């Protein structure tokens, strides 16, 4: 075995929230999980006072539908600004048209430009209507899961809602992983599914699945449309729910006979969301924000713990850090909300976070948790997490406050508004406060020097960490990166220095393999001028490899950096550490020819007309990556990596900072 050399990379209770009171049982609650504030959609015209009963699925049966005209006089509808340009319909105002055409026009009125839709018997009418739209592009995935993940990539990279469409039965159920992923990672998504005709619902008709019931617990809300006249209101509500407050997925199930029925739409229907609107958190009170500033002034070792809830507040967060000098540790979902290469960045914390980020939390006396949910992959053993610190938790979702970790001070509200308010207080009191955490930062700098992110090189083998480091250098940290799930995902989080929000697209809460390639499709569609790279593992990549065909047909310049170690790397790492290296079905190659690369990923690319190359030696890697980046259009680079590599640092599940592992790999026994 070749001698190993080490390479190093250094990166620079008082609760003010109250639980919402239960809503009146007389009003339908079109939301089952969250009580949230909203942000207005500037693309929507104002509504009149006309109200229709909501058609929502019953908890007991998909065929039982609530059809009640609800009195909402006590809860005013939100006032929406008028669109700068009047929408011009291709239909005359009094011209009857199919429900499918009404649905497509409703999407157009929401400003939708792209959908990811795969046709089937129960959704054919929608696809026919899409062909009559001059403004909506359909990107045809090769699998419905690819479609929903692509819609997520579109939404995550742009901040706009992603739209996917599937047929009934298996088409709809193929969306399930994407809906669950969007819910856990707070991604705005509107999924539209075809359904069997109303008269067949509940009869076990061909390709009938009660998708509203199936997805009830993995969507922010869902609808079964039982009246064609409700389509304009339901679509407006779906987009509002998906994008307001804590974003999430909304599913709209449309029976085929509704799609075929002729009607004259009323575009002036008001949204009917009394329960949702009544549970909005109010803007943060100045007194609460001033108390947080006081806690900061009294602390000696504060640290910021920021998550996905800060992605829309990166400017305000940057100003807050500038005013306070507090170091920033990010969750996996929060990467990019603060530049990873800044001297005050501690990079990522948690199970595979940096030693110095976890050290900062362990030794802090004040933890400022903004837009986070205290996930188990971050906290480890809850009782030991930030045990010396006062905790301030700001989040838009009241359900997250105190769910896993009880804060000393909590504010349920928009992180952006809270940061703006605190920045104002800090600016006005700068001379009085004279914040100086230099001693604390020096202490953390010692930890950075002592425990930098590092990896070892063995002969000519290519360390996967090195491949990502080279990609970061050649793209100047400006590419949009998507990943699958596994070791490569963690290395991509560690060794690529994200400078801006929405550069990092990864399945965090659900951990869905197969996410990376279709997510890159969505990102490329939303950002046609950006460099989009799917950093993937061979296990994740092959789960949605069929989407190479979509990339080719749509002429998307998606690059794939495939870190191929022929194994399910993360599971194998746990086998090494906790199961005496007993291999339990984690080898993905051909057991009869273990020395051969199997399957040959280059042939998948060739079958879809995509240029591809393989690199096996470290000395050839930089040139190979540069060629990938310089080649117009899509490209696949198969990087053969040793399977013995481990993602380090590592805090075992349920462990504490004292359990952190910083050495070792699959080449030694445990």
UniProtKB/Swiss-Prot annotation:
EC no. given is 2.2.1.6
Modes of activity regulation: Inhibited by asymmetric aryl disulfides, triazolopyrimidine sulfonanilide compounds, isatin derivatives, and sulfonylurea and imidazolinone herbicides. Insensitive to feed-back inhibition by branched-chain amino acids.
Please state the biotechnological applications recorded for this protein.
Answer: Introduced by genetic manipulation and expressed in sulfonylurea resistant plants.
Q: Which residues form a coiled coil?
A: 414-446
- Per the record, what is the consequence of mutating residue 574 to S? Slightly decreased catalytic activity. Resistant to imidazolinone and sulfonylurea herbicides
Effect the entry attributes to changing residue 653 to T: No effect on catalytic activity. Resistant to imidazolinone herbicides but not to sulfonylurea herbicides
- What are the Low complexity biased-composition ranges? 1-48, 55-77
Cysteine sulfinic acid (-SO2H) occurs at 340
Name the residues that bind FAD: 186, 246, 308, 331-332, 349-352, 371-375, 395-396, 414-415, 508-509
Segments of this protein annotated with the region Disordered: 1-94
Residues that coordinate or bind chlorimuron-ethyl: 256, 376-377, 574, 653
Q: What residues does thiamine diphosphate bind to?
A: 144, 207, 487-488, 511-513, 538-540, 565-570
> Which keywords, in A-to-Z order, does the entry hold?
Amino-acid biosynthesis, Branched-chain amino acid biosynthesis, Chloroplast, Coiled coil, FAD, Flavoprotein, Genetically modified food, Herbicide resistance, Magnesium, Metal-binding, Oxidation, Plastid, Thiamine pyrophosphate, Transferase, Transit peptide
Residues binding Mg(2+), per UniProt: 538, 565, 567
What do we know about how this protein assembles, alone or with others? Homodimer or homotetramer. The acetolactate synthase complex contains both large catalytic subunits and small regulatory subunits. Homodimer. The acetolactate synthase complex contains 4 homodimers of the large catalytic subunits, and 1 homotetramer of the small regulatory subunits.
* Function field: Catalyzes the formation of acetolactate from pyruvate, the first step in valine and isoleucine biosynthesis.
Record-linked PANTHER family = ACETOLACTATE SYNTHASE CATALYTIC SUBUNIT, MITOCHONDRIAL, THIAMINE PYROPHOSPHATE ENZYMES
Q: Which family does it belong to?
A: Belongs to the TPP enzyme family.
- Can you name this protein? Acetolactate synthase, chloroplastic
């Amino acid at each position: 075995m070749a001698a190993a050399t080490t390479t190093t990379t250094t990166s620079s209770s008082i609760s003010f929230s109250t639980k919402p009171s239960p809503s009146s049982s007389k009003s339908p609650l079109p939301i089952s999980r969250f009580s949230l504030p909203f942000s207005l959609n500037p693309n929507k015209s104002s509504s009149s006072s006309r109200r229709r009963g909501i058609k929502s699925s019953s908890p007991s049966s998909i065929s039982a539908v609530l059809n009640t005209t609800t009195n909402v006089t006590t809860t005013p509808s939100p006032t929406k600004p008028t669109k700068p340009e009047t929408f011009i319909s291709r239909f005359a105002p009094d011209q009857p048209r199919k429900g499918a055409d009404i649905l497509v026009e409703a999407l157009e009125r929401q400003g939708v430009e792209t959908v990811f839709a795969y046709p089937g018997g129960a959704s054919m009418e929608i696809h026919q209507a899409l062909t009559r739209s001059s403004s909506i592009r359909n990107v045809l995935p090769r699998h419905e899961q690819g479609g929903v993940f692509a819609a997520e990539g579109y939404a995550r990279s742009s901040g706009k809602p992603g739209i996917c469409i599937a047929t009934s039965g298996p088409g709809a159920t193929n969306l399930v992983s994407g809906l669950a992923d969007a819910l856990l990672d707070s991604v705005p998504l509107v999924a539209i599914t075809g359904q069997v005709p109303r008269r067949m619902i509940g009869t076990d008709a061909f390709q009938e699945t009660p998708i509203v019931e199936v997805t009830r617990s993995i969507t922010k809300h869902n609808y079964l449309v039982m009246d064609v006249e409700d389509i304009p209101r339901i679509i407006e509500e779906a987009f509002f729910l998906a994008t307001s407050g804590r974003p999430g997925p909304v599913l709209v199930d449309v029976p085929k006979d509704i799609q075929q029925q002729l009607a004259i739409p009323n575009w002036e229907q008001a949204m009917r969301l009394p329960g949702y609107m009544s549970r909005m958190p109010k803007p943060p009170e100045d007194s609460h924000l001033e108390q947080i500033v006081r806690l900061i002034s009294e602390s000696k070792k504060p640290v910021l713990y920021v998550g996905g809830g800060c992605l829309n507040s990166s400017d305000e967060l940057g100003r807050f850090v500038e005013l306070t000098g507090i170091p920033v540790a990010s969750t996996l979902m929060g990467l990019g909300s603060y530049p990873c290469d800044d001297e005050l960045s501690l990079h990522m914390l948690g199970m595979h976070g940096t030693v110095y980020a976890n050290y900062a939390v362990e030794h802090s006396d004040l933890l400022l948790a903004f837009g986070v949910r205290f996930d188990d992959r971050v906290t480890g053993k809850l009782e030991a997490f930030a045990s010396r610190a006062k905790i301030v938790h700001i989040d838009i979702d009241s359900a997250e406050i105190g769910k896993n970790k009880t804060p000393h001070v909590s504010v349920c509200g928009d992180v952006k508004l809270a940061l703006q308010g605190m920045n104002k207080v800090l600016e006005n009191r700068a001379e009085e406060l004279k914040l100086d955490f230099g001693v604390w930062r020096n202490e953390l700098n010692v930890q950075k020097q002592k425990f930098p992110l590092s990896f070892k090189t063995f002969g000519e083998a290519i360390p996967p960490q090195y491949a990502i480091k080279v990609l970061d250098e050649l793209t100047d940290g400006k590419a949009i990166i998507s990943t699958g799930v596994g070791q490569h995902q963690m290395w991509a989080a560690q060794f690529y220095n994200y400078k801006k929000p929405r550069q990092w697209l990864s399945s965090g809460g659900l951990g869905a393999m197969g996410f990376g390639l279709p997510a890159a499709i969505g990102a490329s569609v939303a950002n046609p001028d950006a460099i989009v790279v799917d950093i993937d593992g061979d296990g994740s990549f092959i789960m949605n490899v069929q989407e190479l065909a979509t990339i080719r047909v749509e002429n998307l310049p998606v690059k794939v950096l495939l870190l191929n170690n022929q194994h399910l790397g993360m599971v194998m790492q746990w086998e090494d550490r906790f199961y005496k290296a007993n291999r339990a079905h984690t080898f993905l190659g051909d057991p009869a020819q273990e020395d051969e690369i199997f399957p040959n990923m280059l042939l998948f690319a060739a079958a879809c007309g995509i240029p591809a190359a393989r690199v096996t030696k470290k000395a050839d890697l930089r040139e190979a990556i540069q060629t990938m980046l310089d080649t117009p259009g899509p490209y696949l680079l198969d990087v053969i990596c040793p399977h013995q590599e481990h993602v380090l640092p590592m805090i075992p599940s349920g462990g504490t900072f004292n359990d952190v592992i910083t050495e070792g790999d699959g080449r030694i026994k445990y």
